[in-house]
């Protein structure tokens, strides 16, 4: 893929859902096509570099939504955190972000996946299903539930301990480093 010099792909959650995932689910083109299709759940995370355009050590893929997230060496397990994604302008819910981590056997690794999906429209689909059954078979409504965007990265946080013996989370380390930047004066 030939991209201009200085190109950086660092989309927000809203941009991933509205500008990429919604277009993919609606079968609309997205140019430039920077997110490849990949049956992601069959690959171990360390096999992903080189299969997509990556910014730093993170990669983005379109994949089919599935409950089966098992690879040859492990599996992707849910971290139990689902976050709604809202538009910045209207605060309308446009997507859901699910967090998963990769396990080798019973051991959790540092590999994280953020799975972006469009909101479930089952509440409106039950009303429209009666109408659509009467509609002509030539009209096709996109099935938004089939596609997800996955952002995969390896979390590289050292397991430093605080003075009282408790471990710092990655977010704690980020905030502490931002505090350090505040103390630096520019010439």
Swiss-Prot record:
Known DNA-binding region: 94-161
Q: NAC domain spans which residues? A: 3-155
Listed Gene3D superfamilies: NAC domain (2.170.150.80)
One of the protein's GO biological processes = xylem development
Pfam families registered for this protein in UniProt: NAM
GO annotations of cellular component type = nucleus
Ordered alphabetically, the record's keywords are: DNA-binding, Nucleus, Transcription, Transcription regulation
Where does the UniProt entry say this protein principally localizes? nucleus
Localization in the cell: Nucleus
Q: Look up the domain of life of the source.
A: Eukaryota
Tissue expression: Expressed in root xylem vessels. Expressed in stems, vascular tissue of cauline leaves and tracheary elements of sepals.
One Gene Ontology term of the molecular function aspect: DNA-binding transcription factor activity
- Annotated region (Disordered) at 118-142
**Gene deletion effect:** Reduced plant height and length of tracheary elements in the stem.
Functional summary from the UniProt entry:
Probable transcription factor that influences tracheary elements and xylem development by negatively regulating secondary cell wall fiber synthesis and programmed cell death.
What does the UniProt entry state concerning the protein's domains?
A: The NAC domain includes a DNA binding domain and a dimerization domain.
Anything else of interest in the record?
A: Plants over-expressing NAC104 show severe dwarfism and suppression of tracheary element differentiation.
Recorded protein name is: NAC domain-containing protein 104
What is the primary gene name for this protein?
NAC104
């Amino acid at each position: 893929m030939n991209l201009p010099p200085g190109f950086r792909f660092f989309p927000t959650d809203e941009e991933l859902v509205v500008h990429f995932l919604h277009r993919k689910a609606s079968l609309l083109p997205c140019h430039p096509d920077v997110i490849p299709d990949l049956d992601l759940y069959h690959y171990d995370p360390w096999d992903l570099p080189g299969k997509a355009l990556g910014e730093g050590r993170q990669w983005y893929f379109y994949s089919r939504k599935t409950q089966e997230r098992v690879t040859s060496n492990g599996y992707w397990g849910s971290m139990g955190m689902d976050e709604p994604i809202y538009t910045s302008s209207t605060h309308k819910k446009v997507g859901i972000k699910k967090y998963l981590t990769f396990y080798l056997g019973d051991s959790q690794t540092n590999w994280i996946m953020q799975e972006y999906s469009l909101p479930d429209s089952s509440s409106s689909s039950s009303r429209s299903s009666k109408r659509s059954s009467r509609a002509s078979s030539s009209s096709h409504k996109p099935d938004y539930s089939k596609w997800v965007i996955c952002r995969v990265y390896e979390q590289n946080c050292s397991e430093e301990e605080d003075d009282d013996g408790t471990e710092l989370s990655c977010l704690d380390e980020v905030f502490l480093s931002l505090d350090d930047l505040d103390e630096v004066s520019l010439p």
